[in-house]
Curated annotation (Swiss-Prot):
Keywords: Ribonucleoprotein, Ribosomal protein. GO terms for molecular function: structural constituent of ribosome. Part of the 50S ribosomal subunit. The gene is rpmD. The keyword Ribosomal protein applies. Belongs to the universal ribosomal protein uL30 family. One of its GO terms (biological process) is translation. CDD domains: Ribosomal_L30 (cd01658). GO terms for cellular component: cytosolic large ribosomal subunit. PANTHER family: LARGE RIBOSOMAL SUBUNIT PROTEIN UL30M, MITOCHONDRIAL RIBOSOMAL PROTEIN L30. This is Large ribosomal subunit protein uL30.
Length: 61
């Protein structure tokens, strides 16, 4: 299964509550924080919610 590195590039301040909670669920708390997640439909849906706040890169397992 592919892995995704998700990096927060913009603040969640000023966003909707749903966007802020999605960042927290992804494990992102500060700008430039990164987390590695599996490439799953649930994660892709969360990324779609905050696509303007994060950068996504595929990494080797």
């Amino acid at each position: 299964m592919a892995k995704l590195r998700i990096t927060q590039i913009r603040s969640g301040i000023g966003g909707t509550r749903n966007q802020r909670e999605t960042l927290r669920t992804l494990g992102l708390r500060k700008i430039n924080a990164s987390t590695v997640r599996d490439d799953r439909p649930e994660v892709l849906g969360m990324i779609a919610t905050v696509t303007h706040l994060v950068r996504v890169e595929e990494v080797d397992s």
